[in-house]
Amino acid sequence: MKYELNGQVVLISGGSQGLGRAFAQKYIEESDSTVVIVSRSEEKLTRAGEAICGGARRLGAGGAGRLLYYACNLGDAAAVGGLFATLADAGLQVTQVLFCAGGAVPGLFAELSSAQLAAGVEMNYGTALHLAHGAVRHGARHLVFFSSAAAVYPFIGYSQYAPLKAALRALVAVLRQECDGVRVSCVYPGNFASEGYAEENRTKPAITAAIEGSSEAISCAACCDKIVRGLRSGYDDVTTDFVGWLLLACNMGFNYHSTTYFLWPLGWLLGALVNLLVVPIYMLLCRWDIHKWRTQREETHLAAKTD
């Protein structure tokens, strides 16, 4: 199924900011599609509408305009049911769904609160789960999930985030087998500069930042453009940088593979070689870095107690 910007009714979760808002803006500026942005906060949605095109109208309120918004807790299945009922009342048949909602609160597992961990499950998996369930039942033809490079390389500091992004990858694999006639794509973006990314860096442990490295965060608009190019090229596992592509090549697994992708043979070969030759050495280095960090941390705590 070809990816098209034009002629769609597009539902974007997390559409009030970050990458979701960038996609909404792209559809409004470069197509004739109707766009529905969804998030919890009506205030953020109205601000996003003003920034994108001078103002959006609330779904179900009547009036003209291609950009609509709907405030909804997507982690609540009943609320998602209400969203699709409102879409039906407005005469809108959603054709594409972009699952942009999500976010990370980096921190050590034992130091995160139960509320933070539960919020991670809802925000990064529950919202996509319920929205996808409704979308499949209501005839959407293209689902675009947003996972993360952390789904294929989870590491220290991302216990609230990475396991749920990995769960999304598993859900995508199942839906590709179950949903005949529905295109199911999954994006594994690297770092991009957004409100959520700035918030992440406030709580990110030093060891997490060290292992993650100093990769530059690209703009949301640039990230959006890369994803659109990948989808238009027919790729259903889309990355936005070389590191993400390499990580995915190392984690092909029992999953649908886009064998028409011209770099697929290289990815298969390179992934096998990296797994055999590079990963064992790299993981030893990571263990050493974590050991040093843990030792320094214990010494700091001991010195603080002594003082």
Swiss-Prot record:
InterPro entries documented for this protein: KDSR-like (IPR045022), NAD(P)-bd_dom_sf (IPR036291), SDR_fam (IPR002347)
Membrane topology note: Single-pass membrane protein
Database matches in Gene3D superfamilies: NAD(P)-binding Rossmann-like Domain (3.40.50.720)
GO cellular component term, pick one: endoplasmic reticulum membrane
Pfam families registered for this protein in UniProt: adh_short
Catalytic activity: sphinganine + NADP(+) = 3-oxosphinganine + NADPH + H(+)
UniProt-annotated binding residues for NADPH: 14, 16, 18, 40, 44, 74
Superkingdom in the source lineage: Eukaryota
EC number annotated for this UniProt entry: 1.1.1.102
Transmembrane segments: 261-281
Main EC class the enzyme belongs to: oxidoreductase
GO molecular function, one term: NADPH binding
Membrane as UniProt keyword: yes
Motif GXSXG positions after renumbering to this chain: 14-18
GO biological process: 3-keto-sphinganine metabolic process; sphingolipid biosynthetic process
Annotated localization: Endoplasmic reticulum membrane
Alphabetical UniProt keywords: Endoplasmic reticulum, Lipid metabolism, Membrane, NADP, Nucleotide-binding, Oxidoreductase, Sphingolipid metabolism, Transmembrane, Transmembrane helix
Metabolic or biological pathway: Lipid metabolism; sphingolipid metabolism
Binding-site positions, NADP(+): 11, 19, 161, 165, 194
Keyword Plastid: no
Active site: 147, 161, 165
Function field: Catalyzes the reduction of 3'-oxosphinganine (3-ketodihydrosphingosine/KDS) to sphinganine (dihydrosphingosine/DHS), the second step of de novo sphingolipid biosynthesis.
Family membership: Belongs to the short-chain dehydrogenases/reductases (SDR) family.
Protein name, UniProt field: 3-ketodihydrosphingosine reductase TSC10
Organism whose genome encodes this protein: Eremothecium gossypii (strain ATCC 10895 / CBS 109.51 / FGSC 9923 / NRRL Y-1056) (Yeast)
